[in-house]
Amino acid sequence: MSDLPELHWLHGKPTATGRLKSTPEDFKVSEDLGFTLDGEGEHVMVRVRKTGCNTAFVAEKLAKFAGIHPRDASYAGLKDRNAVTEQWFCLRMPGKEMPDFSQFTLEGCEILTTTRQQRKLRIGTLKGNHFTLVLRDISDVTSVETRLVEIQKQGVPNYFGVQRFGRNGDNLRQAWRWATNEIRVKERSKRSFYLSAARSAMFNHLVSQRLERHIYTQVLCGDAMQLHGKRSWFVAEGAELAQIQTRYEEHDIHITAPLPGKGDLGTQAQALIFETDNLADYEALWSLAQQERVDTTRRAINLLPENMSWHWLDDTTVSLSFFLPAGSFATSVVRELILLGNIDAENISE
């Protein structure tokens, strides 16, 4: 079970092939925190455009330039190295003057703006990311154009991307070994990576099973429904299923699946039976998450890209733009358009 399974597609397996990220400029990401910065406070906020640099490396260099410990530099999320990305970095500098960032030099990095903030910027503290991707050498333009229209209307499965599971799925493989007592994992960061891979794999499996059983867009009795744009959810009761189905089709609410851990899954009746039955093969991973006292959370199974648009640069090249909420993967959109090799997919950022 440690190898990454082939997940089902909402719009059918793509027939077209193509290339992503021929150059870093073919993959652009702009982070959106979703709130206005204070303009004052003990934290210096630095907006950086970077190419060919990973996030942690830039944070370390900014901390060194500012004369602070690396642990006092933070960011909201990791961005891909092999891309052009814009994001905020946060430097804790109480009582210190704003550094002269015009003197900061790092190949591939450009300081766009600086300000101050009262609170530390923590992982996950962002609204989402704006993506602009260029897909080249598309073998079946008609198919891709049709799929773009379908995705704009219906969305895509909200799968965790392959990068969530480590290079060649190694984090998931190690999670299985840990769960079956083949290895002991002491390092905190590895425990976190392996648990994340385990829970993401269970989520992906349940989403794929709903597609295979043709209940992906059908609200089941007992489904946990998430309000659009919110983290709160409620259970779909039998007497209200017709009304809830209508709200789902209007994208007002979303069907969810669990990232299993300790505590109840949150579903009831038919939906609970479906989830528990289909997690049977993942019992060891689920037990591991419970043992490590990770809370069960839920996530929408469908991802509807916002502000989606595209235009053809030439006969076989399309430029595609959209916004995704925090925690969603551009992989999920691209995999419904063209067949991607593992190397391409592993290099797509969250």
Swiss-Prot record:
Task: Write out the entry's keywords from A to Z.
Answer: Isomerase, tRNA processing
Q: Which GO terms describe its cellular component?
A: cytosol
Question: Per the UniProt record, which EC number(s) apply here?
Answer: 5.4.99.27
Query: Which positions fall inside the TRUD domain?
Result: 155-303
Uppermost EC category: isomerase
Give the reaction(s) catalysed: uridine(13) in tRNA = pseudouridine(13) in tRNA
The entry's active site is D80
Classification via Pfam families = TruD
Q: List ligand-binding residues for substrate.
A: F27, N129, F329
Entry keyword annotation includes Cytoplasm: no
Q: Which GO terms describe its molecular function?
A: RNA binding; tRNA pseudouridine(13) synthase activity
What is the superkingdom listed in this entry's lineage? Bacteria
Query: Which SUPFAM superfamilies did the record assign?
Result: Pseudouridine synthase (SSF55120)
Q: What Gene3D superfamilies does its record include?
A: TruD, catalytic domain (3.30.2350.20), TruD, insertion domain (3.30.2340.10)
User: Which HAMAP family does the protein's record reference?
Assistant: TruD
Query: What is the role of this chain?
Result: Responsible for synthesis of pseudouridine from uracil-13 in transfer RNAs.
Q: Which family does it belong to?
A: Belongs to the pseudouridine synthase TruD family.
What name does UniProt use for this protein?
Answer: tRNA pseudouridine synthase D
Q: Which organism is it from?
A: Proteus mirabilis (strain HI4320)
